[in-house]
């Protein structure tokens, strides 16, 4: 299927509105309700040091990348049944693509 090209500036707005209450992205950022996302791109699920993940997240065993994030962000609880993440998801493909573009830039 492939992930459409996203706009990182739009993605930042989505992150601030929908994600920042539970996640940080900067190096050395604190865990909140959800883990700090710095360095998560290319890492397996449930691996942020010092964060207490659900068994479902630890056991999923996928690597975060464009395709996995695109599917996960549509419906997190469907993609990882048992996840602690309470976010309902982003149904619009362009919003998911924008958020992914922002996360790729901001979590390096």
Curated annotation (Swiss-Prot):
Binds 1 heme c group covalently per subunit. SUPFAM superfamilies: Cytochrome c. Keywords: Electron transport, Heme, Iron, Metal-binding, Mitochondrion, Respiratory chain, Transport. Coiled coil: none annotated. It is found in: Mitochondrion intermembrane space. InterPro entries: Cyt_c-like_dom (IPR009056), Cyt_c-like_dom_sf (IPR036909), Cyt_c_1A/1B (IPR002327). Electron carrier protein. The oxidized form of the cytochrome c heme group can accept an electron from the heme group of the cytochrome c1 subunit of cytochrome reductase. Cytochrome c then transfers this electron to the cytochrome oxidase complex, the final protein carrier in the mitochondrial electron-transport chain. This is Cytochrome c. It comes from Samia cynthia.
